[in-house]
From Swiss-Prot:
InterPro entries for this protein: Aldolase_TIM, Elp3/MiaA/NifB-like_rSAM, Methyltransferase_A, RlmN_N, RNA_MTrfase_RlmN, rRNA_lsu_MTrfase_RlmN/Cfr, rSAM
Molecular-function GO terms, alphabetical: 4 iron, 4 sulfur cluster binding; metal ion binding; rRNA (adenine(2503)-C2-)-methyltransferase activity; rRNA binding; tRNA (adenine(37)-C2)-methyltransferase activity; tRNA binding
Transmembrane regions: none
Record's protein name: Dual-specificity RNA methyltransferase RlmN
Annotated ranges, domain Radical SAM core: 108-341
The enzyme's E.C. designation: 2.1.1.192
NCBIfam families: rRNA_mod_RlmN
Binding site for [4Fe-4S] cluster: C122, C126, C129
The keyword RNA-binding appears for this protein: no
Amino acids binding S-adenosyl-L-methionine: G172, E173, S204, S227, L228, H229, N303
Task of the protein: Specifically methylates position 2 of adenine 2503 in 23S rRNA and position 2 of adenine 37 in tRNAs. m2A2503 modification seems to play a crucial role in the proofreading step occurring at the peptidyl transferase center and thus would serve to optimize ribosomal fidelity.
Catalyses which reaction(s): adenosine(2503) in 23S rRNA + 2 reduced [2Fe-2S]-[ferredoxin] + 2 S-adenosyl-L-methionine = 2-methyladenosine(2503) in 23S rRNA + 5'-deoxyadenosine + L-methionine + 2 oxidized [2Fe-2S]-[ferredoxin] + S-adenosyl-L-homocysteine; adenosine(37) in tRNA + 2 reduced [2Fe-2S]-[ferredoxin] + 2 S-adenosyl-L-methionine = 2-methyladenosine(37) in tRNA + 5'-deoxyadenosine + L-methionine + 2 oxidized [2Fe-2S]-[ferredoxin] + S-adenosyl-L-homocysteine
Amino acid sequence: MKELVNILDFLPEELGEKIKPMFRVKQIYQWIYQKYANNFSDMSSLPKDLRLELAQNFHFSPVKCVKNEQSKDGSIKYLFELIDGLRVESVLLPMKEEKIDTEGKRISHARYTICVSSQVGCKSSCSFCLTAKGGLKRNLSAGEIVGQILWIKKQNNIPYERRVNIVYMGMGEPLDNLKNVSKAVKILAQNDGLAISPRRQTISTSGLAKQIKELGQMNLGVLLAISLHAVNDELRTELMPINKAYNIAAIMDAVREFPIDQRKRVMFEYLLIDGINDKLEHAKELVKLLNGIKAKVNLILFNPHEGSLYKRPSLENAIKFQDLLSSKGVTCTIRESKGLDISAACGQLKERAKEQ
């Protein structure tokens, strides 16, 4: 039996090499990403013989949802099974956004962020992260990354044109899978597809300096987030062994070279761990470290998980840390940890084995 190819892996120009004429590719993209077709036979504007040809050569179901859990805060965690049986998790984070209409009335509507995985597992071995405990199984293809987003939007009846933010902060180190992640960014940005601007896509990294430079040279227009979590190499190496390969100085050099929109900032994620990196002296060092960089600091309170040796700091200490940074002119927020009750928060995702 012929092995079917995942059509979500293809950019329009690549699909155009297999399907003629090109306007048919545009129609196929619209059926998949905008009309949320369930199968090729749904694509009624295509000739019957083309629909048959597509069904004989392609599929567009690279992920299958086997479980979902909804948090009391509205977040939904999805467990996806891939074609080879491996599993990844993704999270939908709905948020309310308020605006003033032309009559001066306050109106609110849903704004969505989707946190996607880029690998099955991770090899970075960060001591505070549950994902790393199982090691790295493999990279996801571009289509498997895109498939998570497409399935979540379709399942939640989110119109394709509705504004959505994508954060590559799920399972895996995105820059360790740069080829497929960068391709996913391009596929998601297609006007005949989901039309998610690169400016709404944030790639998070544990600090692979070489790949940060490579990403910058691609000029994709994406946002960059650095998982920093420590202000000196000794502590960072203890928390994040990847620091042995790319120390803080190397990361900062790469960040300074990274092209960023004038209206945007590089995000630095800083996980506050009780008694480890949450003292005011750490905050002072962080201010020095970010000098000259157009940065925004996102403080995250450690999210406990099974087997963890670390503790979550008090909100009071986090606010003191934030206040010091703000007083020195550093833009800083404390991230609200969503999905804690369903293990969907930062550092809590993992490849969950099949239930026996």
